[in-house]
C-alpha cells in the first residue's frame, strides 16, 4: 500500500549540495551530507554543516540519526543523537559528530553522507502533576533492568549496578573503550 508523501519545504544554503534522499525504497531516513572537508583526530568532535534548511509542517519534527556504517566502520557517532529539528526552526541543519576511534583519524569529504533525517509526526502533550503515578510491570526499573546483555545478567551479580570509580571515573562506557584498546 502506497501513501502520498508529506511535503517538506527545503532550501539549499549551499547551492551545490544534493538534496536529502532515501537510498532505498522503504527507508525511514533520508541521507544528509556535509558541505565541508574535515578531518577528525581520535576523540575530536566537530559541527558539520549540511547545506540545507527545512520548513516542517506544524505537528511534525525531524530527527537527525547516525548512519550505522559510519559507526561500524569508522567509529563516528553523533554527540546529540538524535538531534531534534523543531517545526519552527529555519536555520541550516548541522550535525555534531565525534570520532570515537582511539587510534585513527576520520576524514570527511565534501558531500559525504554523514547522518539520516527522519521526519515524524509528534504530539504536544499536557503535563498534569499528580502525587503518585499508577503502577506498572516495570515500575522504577531502568538502566538495564530488563536484561538482554551479558553484562546485565543477574547471574553475573552486576544487574542494576553502575560502575564505581576506578581508572574510568565511574564511566562504564569508558571501561569498554579501554578494554577495546587493549585488544
Swiss-Prot record:
GO terms for molecular function: dUTP diphosphatase activity; magnesium ion binding. Pfam families: dUTPase. One of its GO terms (biological process) is dUMP biosynthetic process. Residues 141-150 have a biased composition (Gly residues). Substrate binds at residues 67-69, 80, 84-86, 94. Its EC number is 3.6.1.23. Gene3D superfamilies: 2.70.40.10. Pathway: Pyrimidine metabolism; dUMP biosynthesis; dUMP from dCTP (dUTP route): step 2/2. It catalyses: dUTP + H2O = dUMP + diphosphate + H(+). It comes from the Bacteria. Transmembrane segments: none annotated. Keywords: Hydrolase, Magnesium, Metal-binding, Nucleotide metabolism. Residues 138-183 are annotated as: Disordered. Its cofactor is Mg(2+). InterPro entries: dUTPase (IPR008181), dUTPase-like (IPR029054), dUTPase-like_sf (IPR036157), dUTPase_trimeric (IPR033704). It is an enzyme of class 3 (hydrolase). PANTHER family: DEOXYURIDINE 5'-TRIPHOSPHATE NUCLEOTIDOHYDROLASE (PTHR11241:SF0). This enzyme is involved in nucleotide metabolism: it produces dUMP, the immediate precursor of thymidine nucleotides and it decreases the intracellular concentration of dUTP so that uracil cannot be incorporated into DNA. NCBIfam families: dut (TIGR00576), PRK00601.1 (NF001862). Belongs to the dUTPase family. This is Deoxyuridine 5'-triphosphate nucleotidohydrolase.
Amino acid at each position: 500500500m502506497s501513501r502520498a508523501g508529506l511535503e517538506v519545504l527545503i532550501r539549499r544554503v549551499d547551492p551545490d549540495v544534493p538534496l536529502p534522499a532515501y537510498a532505498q525504497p522503504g527507508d525511514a531516513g533520508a541521507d544528509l551530507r556535509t558541505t565541508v572537508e574535515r578531518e577528525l583526530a581520535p576523540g575530536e568532535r566537530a559541527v558539520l554543516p549540511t547545506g540545507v534548511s527545512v520548513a516542517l509542517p506544524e505537528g511534525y519534527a525531524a530527527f537527525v540519526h547516525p548512519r550505522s556504517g559510519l559507526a561500524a566502520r569508522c567509529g563516528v557517532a553523533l554527540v546529540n543523537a538524535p538531534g531534534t529539528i523543531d517545526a519552527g526552526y529555519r536555520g541550516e541543519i548541522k550535525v555534531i559528530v565525534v570520532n570515537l576511534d582511539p587510534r585513527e583519524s576520520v576524514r570527511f569529504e565534501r558531500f559525504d553522507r554523514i547522518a539520516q533525517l527522519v521526519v515524524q509526526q509528534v504530539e504536544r502533550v499536557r503535563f498534569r502533576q499528580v502525587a503518585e503515578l499508577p503502577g506498572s510491570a516495570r515500575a522504577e526499573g531502568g538502566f538495564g533492568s530488563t536484561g538482554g546483555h551479558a553484562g546485565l545478567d543477574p547471574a553475573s551479580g552486576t544487574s542494576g549496578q553502575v560502575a564505581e570509580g576506578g581508572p574510568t571515573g565511574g564511566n562504564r562506557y569508558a571501561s569498554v573503550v579501554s578494554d577495546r584498546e587493549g585488544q
